[in-house]
């Protein structure tokens, strides 16, 4: 009689111990998924929004801004670990003091992703759903090609901000505002 092997799924902790080997990956439902290579413009937009957020957050002593795909656990059993381009954690979720090791025990209030041409809306919506299901309050999808920002939350319809609109995050960063087009200059 042949034995049937159950598929092996990685946990977030096992995934976190693996060497990167120069690959950009995420853990999706226990499986490693390779991401498309990010080009220089992606890093520019990541730095633009990260700098704007960090400046505001530090000035008002609100929490911490992380970037560059730092992993966060979005679901368990099977585990998923996503790497948002930029994320904001308030001091309510990650208190002042030494930073926790590994994946942080709380989700950020705000996640920002930068859309590349290769990203498909089906996958974007799946990832947005994971973030919102993991207690992220707002997800902003920056679309450099169209110079727009799509803003998602669990309790309202998505909103679209065009280049001349003022982008705000009142639920998590009261007082923060930027004209969308400034993200692309």
Q: What do these predicted ranges mean?
A:
Residues 1-185:
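Gly/Pro/Ser/Thr-rich low-complexity, intrinsically disordered segments predominantly at protein N-termini
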């Amino acid at each position: 009689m042949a034995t049937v092997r159950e598929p092996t799924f990685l946990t977030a902790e096992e995934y976190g111990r693996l060497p990167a080997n120069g690959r950009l990956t995420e853990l999706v439902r226990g499986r490693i998924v390779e991401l498309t290579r990010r080009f220089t413009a992606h890093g520019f937009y990541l730095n633009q929004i990260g700098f704007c957020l960090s400046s505001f957050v530090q000035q008002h002593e609100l929490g911490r801004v992380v970037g560059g795909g730092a992993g966060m656990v979005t679901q368990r059993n099977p585990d998923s670990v996503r790497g948002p381009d930029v994320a904001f954690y308030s001091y309510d979720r990650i208190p002042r003091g030494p930073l926790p090791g590994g994946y942080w025990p709380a989700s950020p209030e705000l996640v920002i992703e930068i859309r590349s041409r290769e990203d498909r809306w089906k996958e974007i919506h799946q990832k947005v759903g994971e973030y919102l299901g993991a207690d992220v309050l707002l997800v902003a999808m920056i679309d450099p090609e169209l110079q727009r920002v799509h803003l998602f939350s669990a309790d309202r319809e998505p909103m679209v901000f065009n280049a001349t609109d003022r982008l705000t995050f009142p639920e998590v960063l009261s007082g923060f505002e930027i004209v969308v087009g400034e993200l692309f200059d």
